[in-house]
Amino acid sequence: MINEEPNYWPRYTIKDHHRLRHQFSQSERVRRNWSQSMQDMFVLSMLDGKRNGVYVEIGADKPKIINNSYLLERKFGWRGVSFELDESKVEFFNQHRKNKCICTDATTFDYKSLFQERNYPKQIDYLSLDIDPSEATLAALKKLPLDEYRFSVITYETEVYRAGIDGYYDEIWQKQSAEIFESHGYELVIKNVANMGNPYEDWWVDPKVVDRAIIGKFSKTDSWSRESTECIFNNTQFSIMPITAILEE
């Protein structure tokens, strides 16, 4: 049984507010981020600090630390659902979160039925896809009812970095995911988002929903990979707050 979360230094703290590429509505209320690579800050940036949004998080892992939906729920009143295969992780998650996590195999789950049961809007605000291994993430993507539901912002794990570590990664998985997103009218804002030098995610948006002026602040095509701090900040330096400040919610 999991009963604690590890300490984790956030990628964003309030001291970095002045360096945000886009100071979204109520960004001054965010003292720290919780996602591993500032996916939460990217979502809030693209949707200009939207309140009361809806998310779908496939691959939840922990309830707070390195979680993509916690900040959205905690500070901006979002509702949504998370998915995780590990039963002990789900039990721990549900002890600490208002919006619950479902224990299931994300590659076979009937998402459409759940969306209908919960009366989710046809335009869902955020989709986080992050499960292991990469082909499982792709399989989960293919199970989503993409012809009937759209997502305003998508963060999609590709694990490109694995190609240089164990040779396990197959670039076809990233290519196939891109083909799926592009065929449904999504726009790639940042490719190969990196964490500590390891490229592992692509970030997409629905250009019919996200303001073109905001997209323009983040789009960059002259580099193969970008560190997450570079994606969100106007420069790559960021502050470290005292541990007492970091633990504040």
Mark where each language-model region is:
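Membrane-proximal basic amphipathic "stem/tether" segments
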Residues: 1-31, 228, 232-249
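Generic detection of long, well-ordered alpha-helical segments
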Residues: 10, 32-37, 87, 128, ...
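Acidic/glycine-enriched edge-of-secondary-structure segments
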Residues: 21-33, 100, 123-132
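SAM cofactor-binding core of SAM-dependent methyltransferases
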Residues: 30-112
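Conserved acidic-Pro-Pro-aromatic motif
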Residues: 70-71, 76-79, 122-129, 133-248
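Conserved amphipathic alpha-helix within the SDR
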Residues: 113-120
